[in-house]
Design a protein with these regions (language model features):
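Structural recognition of the beta-strand scaffold that forms the well-ordered cores
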Residues: 13-18, 53-58, 95-99, 125
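Conserved SGNH/GDSL esterase-like catalytic core that processes O-acyl groups on lipids
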Residues: 1-36, 125
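Short, catalytically relevant binding-site loops at active-site mouths
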Residues: 22-24, 60-63
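Catalytic His-Asp segment of secreted/periplasmic serine-dependent ester chemistry enzymes
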Residues: 61-159
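Catalytic cores of peptidoglycan-degrading enzymes
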Residues: 46, 53-56, 65-67
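Secondary-structure transition/capping motifs at alpha-helix termini
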Residues: 45-48, 52, 145-148
Length: 159
């Protein structure tokens, strides 16, 4: 509630909501619970920021431990969290940036991020460079989307 009041107090034009990494980290990940959490938060924010535009982002991929002391393996629940978010956004006509597939999807997202040294040691959180890259990728996607809008909407043509 306090975080929502803080967001509302900013009177934002755009609210970016990133879900999935924490939700998919638990072994008992539930798509239904994930949907309910997104719906609840979005509903609360829309009450206080009815004119804001909302942009969801999918998780980029992360690792989990394989057993108590096991090696880290790619989190198998991330792809389910991504699908849940993509379906949620599509069913509600919400904007969503699919970082998971932008950075390589099921086969390569984690490998690309690891090879670039963008994960911290826990293989969940990013390094400073990783967060900078995430921001740059999102910025690029927003600019491309805006340019596409300008080309197709403002002149009255549809490409």
């Amino acid at each position: 509630p306090e975080n929502i009041r803080q967001v509302v107090g900013l009177n934002p034009d755009l609210v970016i909501l990133s879900f999935g990494t924490n939700e998919a980290h638990g072994r008992r990940y539930s798509p239904a619970e994930h949907l309910a959490q997104m719906d609840n938060l979005l509903g609360e924010l829309k009450k206080g920021c009815p004119k804001a535009v909302y942009l969801f982002t999918t998780p980029p991929g992360a690792y989990v431990r394989n057993g108590r002391r096991g090696a880290r393996v790619i989190n198998p629940r991330t792809k389910l969290a991504v699908k849940t978010e993509l379906d949620y956004a599509a069913s509600r006509k919400l904007a969503i940036w699919d970082m998971y597939h932008v950075v390589g999807g099921e086969r390569y997202a984690c490998l690309n991020w690891s090879n670039g040294n963008y994960f911290q040691r826990d293989k969940i959180h990013f390094t400073q460079e990783g967060y900078i890259l995430q921001g740059l990728l999102l910025h690029e996607a927003i600019i491309k989307s805006y340019n596409n809008y300008v080309e197709t909407q403002l002149d009255g043509t549809w490409n």
